[in-house]
Curated annotation (Swiss-Prot):
Protein name, per record: Malonyl-CoA decarboxylase, mitochondrial
EC number: 4.1.1.9
Active site, renumbered: 328, 422
Quaternary state and interactors: Homotetramer. Dimer of dimers. The two subunits within a dimer display conformational differences suggesting that at any given moment, only one of the two subunits is competent for malonyl-CoA binding and catalytic activity. Under oxidizing conditions, can form disulfide-linked homotetramers (in vitro). Associates with the peroxisomal targeting signal receptor PEX5.
Function: Catalyzes the conversion of malonyl-CoA to acetyl-CoA. In the fatty acid biosynthesis MCD selectively removes malonyl-CoA and thus assures that methyl-malonyl-CoA is the only chain elongating substrate for fatty acid synthase and that fatty acids with multiple methyl side chains are produced. In peroxisomes it may be involved in degrading intraperoxisomal malonyl-CoA, which is generated by the peroxisomal beta-oxidation of odd chain-length dicarboxylic fatty acids.
Length: 492
């Protein structure tokens, strides 16, 4: 964390005082000429110029008011399209000076060809590194020193990610600025600056409220539901930043069970076996939900650090605890499967997902052609109401899900984001569970299936290195057997 040091104390996360954002339309809308002109003038004043290399440590910091003006102006932009416009102008007009980069690169190359002494070459490389720093990084750096500045930058990145998702702003300059800001936030929110805190029913009401509102995986229905999730045989932990203790950034829910759970309803709906924990009943820790409270921290490795810290905490409390696993949703599986059904439905007579006997069994229950009937049933989750249809679908859905998790890739890594997260952590893709989430959300997003990613603590390091370096997925016999069934029965 070089470059932070004692000055980190100045990076407080207190709420900034800028005008609240009234709701406005989210569709793309160009700024008026007056607003565009105001944006350009603001950026010229707020973004500090890059000092000459020789003066980089002697140039005074810009006046605090210039950064505060940017914060105030940005906070007053009511519409997502306006904020996107300002961020696009910042990324496009205040990045790297490519002329300087080319000049410094040529200098480094020339010195290498001349075989100059190491000190001269190292200084030339340092000049090149300096030229590669975009101007807006200086703005972000100075904003971070304001009261509430880091919190503002977290929200700014959340806005940037939303604008990219809505295609309000696009292009390589915007992607680069997002990466720079993510890197800066990763330093400010590294594990050394994070506090692990446990939530109980006696925690402050505002903490319980925030955690219940930010629960993204299995929504909290009411206060009794929340009480159950922080009560006996349950643990809830969160990370807070050292400058704002008690303010959750990322939250992890854990169930303490007799074995590795295969059904989420048994965790979030059923009452614990007793009000007093009996340690001999606890043999497994199941991570069943992890949620960010700040969308601007996406991609910052808070979840990975949180799981590691919680494992250590649980080992202190329960030295005999031997099994650590997630019980994870499979977002995107139904959407992926519906996409395949759509493609094959357009090509009459083509069937590469189900065997002939499976098609016959499914058609006998639905009374319609397999592809057309399944598209509606899978989208609505209605198929689960028929015991015969559920039985007919169990085999094909299990093997299709195994292939989706194990075989479908993005740049060589698991396509499914939850799978990719746990595999990066070094977990093993351990078990796919049938009808593990019978909620409407579970049925429509992942056909009711859930998966355990098991953490064998002595193997997580090598597994993570193998996955990140060689893109190898460590999987159990059940997963590999289902993948083999897919490969022999399907022709994708």
């Amino acid at each position: 964390m070089r470059g932070l040091g004692p000055s980190l104390r100045a990076r407080r996360l207190l709420p900034l005082r800028y005008p609240p954002r009234p709701p406005g339309p989210r569709g793309p809308r160009l700024c008026s000429g007056l607003t565009a002109s105001a944006m350009d003038e603001l950026l010229r004043r707020a973004v500090p110029p890059t000092p000459a290399y020789e003066l980089r440590e002697k140039t005074p910091a810009p006046a605090e008011g210039q950064c505060a003006d940017f914060v105030s102006f940005y906070g007053g932009l009511a519409e997502a399209a306006q904020r996107a416009e300002l961020l696009g102008r910042l990324a496009q007009g205040f990045g790297v000076d490519h002329g300087q980069v080319a000049e410094q690169s040529a200098g480094v190359l020339q010195l290498r060809q001349q075989s100059r002494e190491a000190a001269v070459l190292l200084q030339a490389e340092d000049r090149l590194r300096y030229a590669l720093v975009p101007r807006y990084r200086g703005l972000f750096h100075h904003i971070s020193k304001l009261d509430g500045g880091v919190r503002f930058l977290v929200q700014l990145r959340a806005d940037l990610l939303e604008a990219q998702a809505l295609k309000l702003v696009e292009g390589p300059h915007v992607r680069e600025m997002n990466g720079v800001l993510k890197s800066m936030l990763s330093e400010w929110f590294s594990s050394g600056f994070l506090n692990l805190e446990r939530v109980t029913w006696h925690s402050p009401c505002e903490v319980l409220q925030k955690i219940s509102e930010c629960e993204a995986v299995h929504p909290v229905k009411n206060w009794m539901d929340m009480k159950r999730r922080v009560g006996p045989y349950r643990r809830c932990y969160f990370f807070s930043h050292c400058s704002t203790p008690g303010d959750p950034l990322v939250v992890l829910h854990v169930a303490l069970t007799g074995d590795i759970s295969n059904n989420i309803q048994s965790i979030v709906k059923e009452c614990p076996p007793s009000e007093t924990e009996e340690k001999n009943r606890i043999a497994a820790a199941v991570f069943y939900s992890i949620s960010l409270t700040q969308q601007g921290l996406q991609g910052v490795e808070l979840g990975t650090f949180l799981i590691k810290r919680v494992v250590k905490e649980l080992q202190k409390e329960f030295p005999h605890l031997g099994a650590f696993s997630s019980l994870s949703p499979i977002p995107g599986f139904t959407k992926w499967l519906l996409g395949l059904l759509n493609v094959q439905g357009k090509e009459y007579g083509r069937n590469e997902l189900f065997t002939d006997s499976e098609c016959k069994e499914i058609a006998e229950v639905t009374g319609d052609p397999v592809h057309e009937s399944l598209k509606g049933l899978l989208s609505s989750g209605e198929w689960a109401k028929s015991e015969k249809l559920a039985q007919a679908l169990q085999g094909p859905l299990m093997r299709l899900c195994a292939w989706y998790l194990y075989g479908e890739k993005h740049r060589g890594y698991a396509l499914n984001p939850v799978a990719n997260f746990h595999l990066q952590n070094g977990a093993v893709m351990w078990r796919i569970n049938w009808m593990a989430d019978s909620s409407l959300k579970g049925l429509t997003s992942s056909c009711g299936l859930m998966v355990n990613y098991r953490y064998y603590l002595e193997e997580t390091g090598p597994n993570s290195i193998s996955y990140l370096g060689s893109k190898n997925i460590k999987a159990s016999e059940q997963i590999l057997s289902l993948v083999a069934q897919f490969q022999s029965n399907s022709k994708l």
